[in-house]
From Swiss-Prot:
The keyword Ribosomal protein applies. Part of the 30S ribosomal subunit. Contacts protein S5. The interaction surface between S4 and S5 is involved in control of translational fidelity. Belongs to the universal ribosomal protein uS4 family. GO terms for molecular function: rRNA binding; structural constituent of ribosome. This is Small ribosomal subunit protein uS4. The keyword Ribonucleoprotein applies. SUPFAM superfamilies: Alpha-L RNA-binding motif. Transmembrane segments: none annotated. Gene3D superfamilies: Ribosomal Protein S4 Delta 41, Chain A, domain 1, RNA-binding S4 domain.
Amino acid sequence: MARYLGPKLKLSRREGTDLFLKSGVRAIDSKCKLETAPGQHGARKPRLSEYGTQLREKQKVRRIYGVLEKQFRNYYKDAARTKGNTGENLLQLLETRLDNVVYRMGFGATRAESRQLVSHKSIMVNGRVVNIPSFKVSANDVVSIREKSRTQARIKAALEVAAQREKPTWVEVDNAKMEGAFKRVPERSDLSAEINEQLIVELYSK
């Protein structure tokens, strides 16, 4: 399955919520009708079945983190094999992706931009260049911008935007040094309450 390259707002309208796919401090502009699906007949919101509701939640989370279907299913399998709550394990695995950590630290304005920074070898983990977006970041790892990439306008712009919003408690960032520490894996209570991971567990358990 190819990665979606079309309008980002269309995906947010499809899921009926802001997926934070666009950069900026504020949420999506009020002109974007999130309660209405895209397309000519978007106003006619169909009544979803139980399966449809579960599928929409899975698609929403997959799009938030920018993960393809096969990758997402593999994350679920790993989460199911891990001791503890499968849904919480799934979200924690997604949160430890390097592209997501780069986004959480404010080095990229969006997860898509953060993924690009990783792929283009602009990111280092513990002093070594890592260009794999799905690389798993561990507690106490130090993530930094590579020296030769620190003058990039988009990184500076992202840091300015990030400075205006509250940083997650599980990362510690030094904007001057352009580096941050991943202090711990976030708990479920740290993450968005708008995600219902249990629906995803129910979907994949069938």
